């Protein structure tokens, strides 16, 4: 996150744990959660100093109370930081389909309460119900480990994202690899559905 901030990236979103990852072995899930706890403890100590905001995407209800408390603590620190500071988004117990369903349920509940009408809904309003509300859609999605699939990641938000695939495994994905991905992205002509000029 610090390197991204230093080279001028404004937002970074990482897929830490998906809704499907609960299907992994208990040992593997425990190891991932232990790593997350370590990361969050470090974040609590360094966020203010480094001016790094932290935001979570996903349904936090099944997450262990200790991790939820740490996430809440990072939320409180983020509240005191400038909106202009770098922001790291962590997808935790996140799935793109689940995010869309949760957004639809929130909108439907507001319709049932008379706060909204179905005809109010457009893309802009719908985006306010997503975990990523107020955050720009990603310009670049990097897929490491030789995989060439979305894996249920930011399904709504990636409509016009550029994709970069690499065989480099996630643990080995370093600053040099990130620089390669950014250089590849910068060489592209983004048309957002239009024609090349």
Q: Where are the predicted features?
A:
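Flexible, compositionally biased loop and terminal segments
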Residues: 1-197
């Amino acid at each position: 996150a610090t390197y991204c901030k230093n080279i001028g990236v404004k937002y970074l979103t990482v897929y830490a744990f998906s809704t499907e990852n609960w299907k992994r072995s208990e040992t593997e899930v425990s190891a991932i959660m232990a790593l997350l706890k370590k990361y969050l403890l470090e974040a609590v100590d360094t966020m203010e100093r480094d001016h790094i905001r932290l935001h979570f995407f996903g349904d936090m209800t099944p997450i262990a109370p200790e991790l939820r408390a740490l996430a809440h603590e990072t939320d409180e620190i983020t509240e005191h930081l400038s909106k202009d500071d770098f922001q790291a988004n962590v997808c935790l117990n996140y799935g793109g389909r689940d995010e869309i369903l949760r957004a639809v349920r929130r909108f439907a509940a507001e319709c049932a309460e008379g706060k909204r009408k179905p005809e109010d809904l457009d893309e802009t309003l719908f985006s306010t119900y997503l975990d990523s509300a107020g955050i720009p859609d990603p310009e670049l999605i990097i897929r490491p480990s030789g995989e060439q699939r979305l894996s249920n990641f930011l399904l709504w938000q990636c409509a016009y994202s550029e994709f970069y695939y690499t065989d480099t495994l996630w643990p080995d994905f370093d600053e040099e690899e990130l620089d390669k991905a950014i250089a590849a992205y910068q060489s592209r002509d983004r048309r957002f559905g239009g024609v090349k000029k």
